[in-house]
Amino acid sequence: GQIEQIFTNYFAGQGLASAPTDFDGRSDYGPFIEAGIPAGGLFSGAEGIKTAQEAAIYGGTAGEPYDACYHQACDSIQAPNNNLSDQALAELGDAAAHAIWTLGKTSTGFYADGSRMAASQAVSLDQFDYRGGQLVR
């Protein structure tokens, strides 16, 4: 989609390798896309195993998990267990900032009519009982 293309173009422009990943609802973006809100993001690996080709492109060790600490007690940015890659954080953080900037300054939306919201997904707040944590009806 359009968000993925923003990231792809950014990485290419920076001379950085990148690869698409499945956008399958596994993460916290599911409710956004269910509500018709465009979503996209970055992925640096989880419990998958790095291939020899990926190790040659991105570094690391073939046959090892992308993130051996994924959802484990050692998954921390606190010493002594800091398993955060400063390089990955810088590259992905810059890509995210670029995407936010690109989307924020555009005058067109994601839909065929140029809008920022799909007409079929438009919802009036008047039909909800709550606004934030406040009961309004």
Question: Which ranges hold each PLM region?
Answer:
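Secretory-pathway/membrane protein signature
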Residues: 1-137
